[in-house]
Amino acid sequence: MTLKLTYFDIHGLAEPIRLLLADKQVAYEDHRVTYEQWADIKPKMIFGQVPCLLSGDEEIVQSGAIIRHLARLNGLNGSNETETTFIDMFYEGLRDLHTKYTTMIYRNYEDGKAPYIKDVLPGELARLEKLFHTYKNGEHYVIGDKESYADYVLFEELDIHLILTPNALDGVPALKKFHERFAERPNIKAYLNKRAAINPPVNGNGKQ
C-alpha cells in the first residue's frame, strides 16, 4: 500500500502523524506544499483542508481520522473497548488543549502569550497529568505498557509547549518524564534529529 501525506512544511496538525509513521517505520511520501501551491490544491480536498492521507486509492482527511486509521493498522488503538475509549478520551483532551493553544497563537499571540502560560496552561496540564496516572501510575504510556496513537499526540503537544516556554512541564513530573522517555525511542530520536536539521516552524504564522 502506497501512502502519501500532504500538509504544509510546519508541525501543525500533521506532526503526530509523522511521528507515528516514523516510529513504526511505515514508508510514505511526505508531501509538503507551499502556501502558493495550496491555493490550487485546496478546492480538490474533501473539506478544503489538510492534512490529507492517500492510502492507495482512498483519500482520508481530518487529522483525527488519519491518526486513528493508522492506529488501527499498527496496533495502536488499545486491546479492548475500555482501552480504546480511554485513548480516545485522552486524545480529545489533548485536542481541547491544542485548540486553546492555537487560538492564542493565531489570534492573540503578543498580548495573550503571557496570560496563557500563567493562567491557562498549568490547569490544562494538571488535568492531563492526573489522567495520565490512570494506567501504571503514569510510569509508561497513556495506557500503561503499550503505546497508542494518543502517545504521539501527547508527545507533540508537550513538545510545542516546551518551545513556547521551557519550564512548561516543571509542575507535571509524570508528563515531563514521559516526554523525555518518548524522545529516546530509537526511531523517534532519529526522526527528531532529522527534523532538527530542517527546523520547520511549528505554526503557519511563524509564531514558534
Swiss-Prot record:
Q: Which reaction does it catalyse?
A: RX + glutathione = an S-substituted glutathione + a halide anion + H(+)
Report domain GST C-terminal positions: 80-202
UniProt KW keywords: Transferase
Protein name, per record: Glutathione S-transferase P
Tell me the function of this protein.
Answer: Conjugation of reduced glutathione to a wide number of exogenous and endogenous hydrophobic electrophiles. Prevents dopaminergic CEP neuron degeneration in response to Mn(2+).
Species of the source: Caenorhabditis elegans
Q: Does the keyword Transferase apply?
A: yes
What biological process terms from GO does the record include? Answer: cellular detoxification; defense response to Gram-negative bacterium; glutathione metabolic process; innate immune response; IRE1-mediated unfolded protein response; negative regulation of cellular response to manganese ion; positive regulation of cellular response to manganese ion
Domain of life from the UniProt record: Eukaryota
Record lineage: Eukaryota, Metazoa, Ecdysozoa, Nematoda, Chromadorea
Q: Kindly state the subunit structure of this protein.
A: Homodimer.
Which Pfam family is one of those matched by this entry? GST_C_3
Swiss-Prot/TrEMBL induction comment: By manganese.
Signal peptide, first to last residue? none
Task: Locate the residues binding glutathione.
Answer: 7, 38, 42, 49-50, 62-63
Tissues expressing the protein: Expressed in dopaminergic (DA) neuron (at protein levels).
Q: Which InterPro entries match?
A: Glutathione-S-Trfase_C-like, Glutathione-S-Trfase_C_sf, Glutathione_S-Trfase, Glutathione_S-Trfase_N, GST_C, GST_pi, GST_superfamily, Thioredoxin-like_sf
